[in-house]
Amino acid sequence: MFRRHFLTLSLTLCLALFCLIPNAEALGGKQPSLNEPAPEFTLPTNTGDGKISLSDYQGKWVVLYFYPEDFTSGCTLEAKRFQQDLSKYQARNAQIIGVSADDVQSHEAFCDATGVEFPLLADTDGSVSKAYGSWLGIRSLRHTYLIDPDGMLREIFLGVKPPIHSRQVLARLDELQQ
């Protein structure tokens, strides 16, 4: 009897908590504001001179995408889709940058295994993910931010679906560039 009441109470509490939180994306923290300067950052990377700052891409559109972890199925699919469309982004003066809590060595191995040619940044302490409202405990959430050539945040994608996400970002980029 006690066990049944305990399970019922536990289930009720979990359901109530689930209903109080509108969606998992809200758990990542406060999102930066659209049409305001995007939070500046500098992080280690697997490419170039070893560090990348947002300001390095002044004059270009930036597709800044956060993802949970190298070598997981959804993250691998998302990265491969961005890579497949890389020339389309380049034709639109856009740079793709991936961010996760993985270290540089993991990013190097991930790029070697998947053929990804754009930079991946190592946000091992979550500081940049937190600044973008994309951090949940020990990893980044799957969020993407479109930043214009002047460093202004123009679009936020939450609840990303890896199989179609790159196409969605390209479509929105086209709208914003008109």
Locate the predicted segments by residue:
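Bacterial N-terminal signal peptides that target proteins for export
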Residues: M1-L11
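N-proximal helix/coil linker or "cap" segments that precede and/or mark the start of modular domains
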Residues: H5, L17-E40
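Short loop/turn microsegments at loop-to-beta-strand junctions
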Residues: P39, W61, L141-H143
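A short beta-strand-turn-helix
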Residues: F41-V62
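Hydrophobic beta-strand anchors of alpha/beta hydrolase catalytic cores
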Residues: V63-L64, I96
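Aromatic-flanked redox-active Cys/Sec active sites in thiol-based oxidoreductases
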Residues: Y65-F71, A101
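Structural microenvironment flanking redox-active thiols in thiol-disulfide oxidoreductases
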Residues: G74-T114, T124-K130
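Thiol-/selenol-based redox modules, centered on thioredoxin-like
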Residues: S140-Q178
